[in-house]
Amino acid sequence: MSVTAESPSLRGGSILENKQELIDLKNIGEHARTVQPFKTSKHQPLIQGSVSKEAAIATHSALHFDLTPEKEKKIRDMYDRLDADNDGSIDIRDLTQALSLQAHIPASVAPKLLERMKSEHSDRVTYADFTNYVIAHEARLAEVFDKIDLNSDGEVDMAEIKSYCKEMGVNLDDQKAMSIVKKMDQSGSSSVNLNEFQDFMLLYPSTDMRDMVDFWRHNLIIDIGEDGQVPEDFTPQELLSGVWWRHLVAGGVAGAMSRTCTAPFDRIKVYLQVNSTKTNKLGVVSCVHLLHAEGGIKSFWRGNGINVIKIAPESAMKFMCYDQIKRWMQEYKGGAELSTIERLLAGSSAGAISQTAIYPMEVMKTRLALRRTGQLDKGMFHFAHKMYTKEGIKCFYKGYLPNLLGIIPYAGIDLTVYESLKSMYTKYYTEHTEPGVLALLACGTCSSTCGQLASYPLALVRTRLQARAISPKNSTQPDTMVGQFKHILQTEGFTGLYRGITPNFMKVIPAVSISYVVYEKVRKQLGATMT
């Protein structure tokens, strides 16, 4: 007894041929061992040749017959948004561009996300790949959601987020836990359902519980408004694994590159702070010509060496002091997590201690930036020895008081203005639960500018006190902070308190950009990932 079987195959594009073969049913077992299965490897994308994107989407949607029309539309809309160049597939550029427009998923995860989405031997994501990723990732996220949802009521609230993070070794206070909930909550219910959780975490490539907690902690709580004011927090696990020193090294290298590249702006600023007056009308352009004529191109980097050298001791001391002060404050509170204001206070205190320790290097930086050609022939240590011999130990702490007083106003005003602008944005743009990246950058820029405007007069007085002994025209000026303020207001008016602020603002964008790019590169090379 035999039966005829038809096996379809595609040849030459659309030509369909039927191949007939006789199968002896007595030897069906032997035959089965020789038959090639229909699908022996991962599917190949159907978007090939002249097949349109719409036709490919329709074909792949038909393969997932269990999807509802609403779900299909949601996946299709998301795929279209990610496919920035509309070429029918998603590559690394599409993902990076899409994530850069998201307020909560960092663009740095784009390579890992692409790896999770694409087929094994491809560098692009087809609609079929994306659909498979969404279905599988949402299933894994549902499992994570069930673990967080302790009372199984279908909603995750602040207490459950707090408990979940504690289980992963991260203690959060109520304010921080609620911050995470608010970022995910789309309905304003102060809790998160499964759909909201899946939507929020869909483009974050990991469902590992530890990774997700790190992502929440470093991207949903601490944002750009606090950068530079409060040192980075590290969990006990990160301290033990060495993540902390990798981030400090990355920050040090980034700071060195940023300061070196923007050193000319810094030297112009210092020169204008000390030498610009109402009568000589010395400006940025005339200052550039003057400095170049005196010492050439290299003169614009005077004082940069010690400015770079002081990064390491200052960063290390600030980190250690911040960690110790935090522990004391937490012990005083009975182990509770610190609030934002308390962290700001701890960070400012750590900054004050580290500034006190390295302040002599700050004074030397100012004097080296103002030196003339030939005044450093015997090296930096000889330069410091000359200062000590001529003026005594006190010279290394000239301008210390205005420097110390400038720390808290800058940090406090920066953070206050930032939070106020964020609140105003969400109040007037109610359709957005959280500001986007551009809005956050605008808030951060405005708050930083306000902080600088408030603290700049103190910085100017500090610089003049540091340079008073080596500046003949300033040697008759008062040797105290209050005396300097009175002298400037009487002789130059209110605008005299802002001499040199133009190059200070000019260096902000290149300094931040260089620092961010270098930090990310070095951090990745060292394997210090916390998101």
From Swiss-Prot:
UniProt entry tagged with the keyword Transcription regulation: no
Protein name: Probable calcium-binding mitochondrial carrier F17E5.2
Function, in words: Calcium-dependent mitochondrial solute carrier.
GO terms assigned for molecular function: ATP transmembrane transporter activity; calcium ion binding
Subcellular location as annotated: Mitochondrion inner membrane
Solcar repeats: 242-328, 338-424, 435-525
GO CC terms: mitochondrial inner membrane
Record organism: Caenorhabditis elegans
Recorded topology in the membrane: Multi-pass membrane protein
Main localization category: mitochondrion
EF-hand domain mapped to chain residues: 70-105, 106-135, 136-171, 172-207
GO term, biological process aspect, one: ADP transport
Transmembrane segments: 248-265, 303-322, 348-361, 399-418, 441-458, 500-517
Binding residue positions for Ca(2+) 1: 83, 85, 87, 89, 94
InterPro entries attached to this UniProt entry: EF-hand-dom_pair, EF_Hand_1_Ca_BS, EF_hand_dom, Mit_carrier, Mitochondrial_sb/sol_carrier, Mt_carrier_dom_sf
Entries under SMART domains matching the protein: EFh
Top-rank taxon, per record: Eukaryota
Record keywords: Calcium, Membrane, Metal-binding, Mitochondrion, Mitochondrion inner membrane, Repeat, Transmembrane, Transmembrane helix, Transport
Gene3D superfamilies: EF-hand, Mitochondrial carrier domain
Similarity section: Belongs to the mitochondrial carrier (TC 2.A.29) family.
Residues binding Ca(2+) 2: 149, 151, 153, 155, 160
